[in-house]
Amino acid sequence: MAKFQAKSQNDAPDDGLKEKMIAVNRVTKVVKGGRILGFAALTVVGDGDGRVGMGKGKSKEVPAAVQKAMEEARRNMTKVSLKNGTIHHNVFGHWGAANVMMAPAPKGTGIIAGGPMRAVFEVMGITDIVAKSHGSSNPYNMVRATMDALNNSTTASEIAAKRGKSVEEIFG
């Protein structure tokens, strides 16, 4: 039989991805004998060039929960098209009671966004953006709403391809 070595939790894969932990919550499961304490971690992972993923992990210990969240974030990565360090056009997204609005910004503006949205933008490589959140400030819902908005963005070439026209005809 082959022997398997246990991978230590400090061995992060060297794949060039940026990782950010957004939140760690203490959670409780109530059972007949009392309460079982655990932890839930929310993380985002990105390559700095438009790919970003989010993950949530739960465990009895914080490091294990963070590790599970990072692994899930790596599995759930999506590609978002960027234009000179910002997005192509205004986009809106929502998840639950969280609503987010994002607008492209000129070079040098920086990331004008709060809380969990800023972490998503930093790991995916956006350098200039203006973003506003309304409604729920729950970190999980805000990250999901941000991902929803980013997935709703399209490029001019994608719109032209859908319409069967050239990019020049679209901008007229």
Curated annotation (Swiss-Prot):
Q: Which GO terms describe its molecular function?
A: rRNA binding; structural constituent of ribosome
Q: Which UniProt keywords apply?
A: Ribonucleoprotein, Ribosomal protein, RNA-binding, rRNA-binding
- Report the protein name in the record: Small ribosomal subunit protein uS5
Q: Which GO terms describe its biological process?
A: translation
What InterPro entries does UniProt report for this protein, alphabetically?
Ribosomal_Su5_D2-typ_SF, Ribosomal_uS5, Ribosomal_uS5_bac-type, Ribosomal_uS5_C, Ribosomal_uS5_N, Ribosomal_uS5_N_CS, Ribsml_uS5_D2-typ_fold_subgr
- Provenance organism: Polaromonas sp. (strain JS666 / ATCC BAA-500)
Q: Which HAMAP family match?
A: Ribosomal_uS5_B (MF_01307_B)
Gene name tied to this protein: rpsE
Q: Which NCBIfam families match?
A: rpsE_bact
